[in-house]
Regions:
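A short, aromatic/hydrophobic, helix- or strand-capping loop or linear motif
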Residues: 11-12, 78-83, 103-109
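An amphipathic alpha-helix signature
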Residues: 18, 60-67, 87, 91, ...
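Single conserved hydrophobic/aromatic residue that forms the stacking wall/gate
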Residues: 1-6, 10
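A short helix-loop-beta-strand connector motif used in the catalytic cores of GNAT acetyltransferases and
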Residues: 16-18, 94-108
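Acyl-donor (CoA/ACP) binding surface of acyl/acetyltransferases
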Residues: 43-74, 104, 108-220
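Conserved GNAT-fold acetyl-CoA-binding loop/helix
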Residues: 74-96
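Short beta->alpha transition motifs characteristic of CBS
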Residues: 14, 21, 32-38, 120-123, ...
Length: 220
């Protein structure tokens, strides 16, 4: 028999999809795991494995783990979004952003599958080049200083350049977010300047963005 699992293309049918399908030698389906559409990751989201991490699509089952991370003001205030107040708020973020958004992953530890952060690549809104992307990420404060984010960023850069065919990947962070700056510099990003008054946050504060970029031929 042959099986198709999380790393394969999901087969959609009706209001959901087959997450895992077992076929007999003639290709007939003999066993499957079916999930509703809201739990289905967008087409093209692949599982990425590193030495210590598994980057996988988000599901609604991640609601509590996302809330546990994102209720921390030290995380949200460094990333530009309001700290989560309720599980319902975290679920809404999952349903409207993390789950439907292509090339967005939950960062989980291999050792215990604990969700510790998020990472993704989006089209760069500041550049007209369709082969330019923008990377964004956050990490649970309890996991800071362990090298997890550098490991995840390295894997997603490889995916962006070599799987998506991007020629440039950018990143922005607040001037006070020194940890994010160190990650980008470690990965070989070049600092290209300050975009002044770039963002009005949820609490009506105006922030500058430090802007970085990395071209494919400079990937470490």
């Amino acid at each position: 028999v042959r099986s198709r699992g999380l790393g394969d293309v999901y087969k959609r049918q009706g209001d959901g999809y087959f997450e895992s399908v077992i076929l007999d030698p003639d290709g007939n389906r003999i066993e499957c795991v079916y999930k509703k559409e809201q739990e289905c990751p967008p087409e093209g989201n692949h599982v990425i494995e590193t030495e210590r991490l598994i980057l996988r699509p988000f599901t609604e089952n991640d609601t509590e783990a996302v809330f546990n991370c994102c209720q921390n003001p030290n995380l949200g205030n460094n990333a530009g979004w309001k700290p989560h107040d309720t599980l319902e708020e975290s679920l809404k973020i999952l349903q409207t952003i993390f789950i439907p958004q292509k090339d967005t992953w939950a960062i989980t530890r291999k050792e215990d599958r604990l969700l510790i952060g998020a990472i993704g690549i989006l089209p760069d809104p500041k550049r007209e080049n369709s082969n330019a992307g923008m990377i964004g990420y956050w990490l649970d404060e309890a996991q800071w200083g362990k090298g997890y984010m550098s490991e995840a960023v390295c894997a997603v850069l490889d995916y962006g350049f070599n799987k998506l065919g991007l020629t440039l990947i950018s990143a922005n962070c607040y001037p006070q977010n020194k940890r994010s700056q160190r990650v980008l510099e470690k990965m070989g990003f070049t600092y290209e300047g300050i975009l002044h008054q770039a963002e009005v946050s949820y609490d009506d504060k105006i922030y500058d963005h430090l802007c970085y970029y990395l071209e494919k031929n400079n990937l470490k």
